[in-house]
Amino acid sequence: MRTEIISIGNELLQGQILDSNAQHISTALSQIGLKVMQITVLPDEIEAIVEALAATKQRSCKIVITTGGLGPTSDDVTKEALAKYLDCPAVVFSKERLSNLGGVDTPVIQYLERATNSSVNISDLQLGGIKNVLGTAPGIYCKQNNQILIVLPGVPTEMQAMLRDTVLPYLQSNFTLPIFYQKTICTIGISEEEIAAILAPWESRLPAPIKLAYLPDLATVKITLAATVPTWEESKRLVEEEFLRVLPLIEPYVYGYNTDTIEEVISRLLKSQKNSLSVAESCTGGYVSQLITQVPGSSVYYQGGIVAYNNTAKHKILGVARNTLLQYGAVSQETAMEMARNVRLKLKANIGLATTGIAGPGGGTIEHPVGTIWIAYADENTCYAQKLQLTNNRLYNIQLTAYHLLDLLRKKLQGK
């Protein structure tokens, strides 16, 4: 069943924002067995939208989901474009009239006649409004000539709620979707190329129904195994068998499964071990603390963080010895370890973490080029530091350092 996504908005094409909606929709659809075959990004222009919708019909696309252009401003033209594409009056898609519709699959003839005060001849069109509980712009459901159009707002929180609460349940209850089972392995500390090389012999022997996908991100790579076969039981059996074969090959790099994030895994470990945590940050400027506190309930184990950016702060606030800073410098194993030990004691935590280094793009020397970073871990019995040599990109260095540090913490908590 061919499915496509159309993302509408000048801001997407101008690079002002990322198209996170398409990513979210694609992920959600894949989890119910629908494969997105094409994603199109369009400007807020009626003709461009009409042409794109017409092209989906030429490609025999069964389901089209659009996002964006439902708001009240002059550049929100999706409803006008939809009316032109369906050859029906634009007043049909007014906010007031959509809000009065019961739901999807509403018989449309009488509705259209009431909306326009005239006789219409659109006997093959079904229309429904999709309730938007988080915003003011209702979504739109249209079915015509065996094609389903689902029109959603571009605001991510609104779109996600409507997709979850209305669209996905509708698709699952009204279509015979492919039966499939999938499992994702989440890795960190290894590149996509390195994983692919390790898995190549195993991958070459995969049964035909098994599909393998790699999803690299900043510091992680996710590997998804999926099988589409006549029964769910058979799909699960195939995936689980290959999962057990592949896991030992990359086990040192595995931090979780399916939708796990490294922060969530650490949260579970800290809670189960009744450990507490504190962080001293220099080059990461609080980013480690941000990641940790993104997890609900992190106050149970997270005591707090200290951003000590210059040497004065490192000495006066964290208590790093002047001699350490003078003899070894701020970017050193010795300073990183003192930061980790001292923040643990100052904030009365079981575990202390630290980052110090040169994020860039300036500040590097021959001895310590840009991207030279030290991360450290300290508990009651041990203290350990690790050197990283990263890139010239400041933001990348900050983010990657944080993930390296969280992975170091994970390994320590797991006794690795």
UniProtKB/Swiss-Prot annotation:
Similarity remark: Belongs to the CinA family.
Signal sequence, renumbered to the chain: none
Pfam families: CinA, MoCF_biosynth
Upper taxonomic lineage: Bacteria, Pseudomonadati, Bacteroidota, Cytophagia, Cytophagales
Top-level lineage group: Bacteria
Classification via NCBIfam families: cinA_nterm, molyb_syn, PncC_domain
Entry protein name: CinA-like protein
